[in-house]
A protein has these predicted regions:
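Cytosolic-side transmembrane-helix boundaries in multi-pass membrane proteins
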Residues: 140-177
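Transmembrane helical segments that form the transport core of multi-pass membrane transport proteins
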Residues: 67-88, 92-99
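Long hydrophobic alpha-helical segments that form multi-pass transmembrane helix bundles
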Residues: 1-54
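Hydrophobic alpha-helical transmembrane segments in multi-pass integral membrane proteins
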Residues: 85-90, 95, 135-148
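Alpha-helical transmembrane segments of multipass membrane proteins
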Residues: 57-61, 79-83, 108-109, 113, ...
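Loop-to-transmembrane alpha-helix initiation sites
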Residues: 96-103, 126-128, 145-157
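Hydrophobic alpha-helical segments embedded in the membrane of multi-pass proteins
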Residues: 51-54, 72-80, 99-113, 127-135
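Membrane-helix interface "capping/anchor" motifs
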Residues: 61-72, 116-127
Length: 177
């Protein structure tokens, strides 16, 4: 039945762009930015199409299911740190774009980190939470044995949510400490 319905194979069996970046083979990552954005690349299930994940995240944002604080601070921190600490052999902007769009960053920032039960309550705490998730993600991607660090970063920051909420709790007006 395959020759009748499909003229060519639609399976990609190769290293993901993040694993190529992790191993230092920056020349192996020869994908166009548009290919990476629409998901025409190798990758794990659920993290392929940044475009569709972005559409889903923006839909939740516009329907007021989530706020902008966690996704923007999470993705922004990863973008800033990967740009600032890009390898000398790579173009910093290209390295940053591939690092942001390759892997589960969009899935984690838009859908996992914004879970009602595990994210901080107020906006300041949510920004701190997103920055922490982004910093831990970059640390794991650069220095640990894993290509991806989003899920581990979210789990570690979930342990600190109670402390972030305690530190960023608004003080009632007129009350002395």
């Amino acid at each position: 039945w395959v020759p009748i319905f499909a003229k060519q194979s639609d399976i990609v069996a190769s290293a993901t762009p993040l694993s190529s970046l992790k191993s230092g083979n920056i020349s192996d990552v020869n994908l166009d930015i548009v290919q990476v954005f629409i998901g025409d690349k190798a990758g794990c299930i659920g993290e392929i199409s940044c475009m569709l994940l972005l559409v889903g995240g923006l839909l939740m944002l516009f329907r007021r299911v989530i706020t902008w604080h966690i996704p923007v601070s999470f993705i922004g921190t990863v973008a800033f740190l990967t740009y600032a600490f890009a390898p000398q052999s790579a173009d910093a902007v290209s390295f940053m774009i591939y690092s942001v769009m390759s892997g589960g960053l969009f899935l984690g920032a838009w859908f996992m980190a914004t879970d009602y039960v595990t994210c901080p309550i107020n906006p300041t705490g949510r920004i701190i939470y997103g920055i922490g998730c982004g910093a831990i993600t970059v640390f794991i991607r650069f220095f640990a044995g894993f290509n991806e660090g989003v899920s581990f970063a979210i789990l570690v920051m979930n342990l600190l949510v109670w402390y972030i909420d305690k530190l960023t709790r608004p003080r009632p007006f007129g009350k002395m400490k």
